[in-house]
């Protein structure tokens, strides 16, 4: 009876996790609509999408029945994530403009596929129980997942340095926090350290981002309002479209101008 209830809770949490993860995967869609309209990737980087693709590939391998049984929901969302990231990277490949950039993307993709394929072959041929395979693939998956959640550290550092939230979208921070939280719960029903630990780390990073948002929200509004007045920006400027108006490396300089330093 208890086992059936735990399975039901796990399934409900997993479905919720799939929905939130889907929202997270689709969150860059406006960026790629902008790229298609402009027919240029401008200064956007493919690295976040390459990193997410690698994480999804390893997660999909981890969730296979012959590696970690009863993880259908994990395989499902990982497969969806792989598809979405491939679409994004294809758009990036088409509009990146320089052949050198295309070669770099192709090389990184090749290395990722070869790495995951090699890992799969080694695990499935050299290890003969699902427990052994779970540990081997789980450790690799745990590392990549934790690295993905730690990727906003540079943005968080910029927020603290500039006292501006312009490059840390609130909605993305909230969805990331919820995603990590739901998959942490999923990793505890029953306990799976390779899901619970990295997603627990993700919860911490997500919470820190929300704390930063609460800390610097007022100062960001003041900075943007002053900047609009001083630099002659026209129209209503919101947090969501500041990216289109200011390059990250110029924020400290602009903030000094606004402050009159």
UniProtKB/Swiss-Prot annotation:
Q: Which spans are transmembrane here?
A: 12-32, 47-67, 75-95, 103-123, 135-155, 169-189, 194-214
**Does the record carry Iron-sulfur as a key word?**
no
Name a GO CC annotation attached to this entry.
plasma membrane
Q: From its record, what is one biological process in GO terms?
A: protein homooligomerization
- Matching InterPro entries, A to Z? SWEET, SWEET_rpt
Q: Name one GO molecular function term.
A: sugar transmembrane transporter activity
Q: Which UniProt keywords apply?
A: Cell membrane, Membrane, Repeat, Sugar transport, Transmembrane, Transmembrane helix, Transport
Q: Where in the cell is it found?
A: Cell membrane
Q: Which segments sit on the Cytoplasmic face? A: 33-46, 96-102, 156-168, 215-261
Q: What are the MtN3/slv domain coordinates in residue numbering?
A: 12-99, 137-221
Per its database record, what is this protein's job? Mediates both low-affinity uptake and efflux of sugar across the plasma membrane.
Subunit note: Forms homooligomers and heterooligomers with SWEET5, SWEET8, SWEET11, SWEET13, SWEET15 and SWEET17.
Per the record, the similarity remark reads: Belongs to the SWEET sugar transporter family.
| Name recorded for this polypeptide | Bidirectional sugar transporter SWEET6
The taxonomic lineage of its organism, from the top, reads: Eukaryota, Viridiplantae, Streptophyta, Embryophyta, Tracheophyta
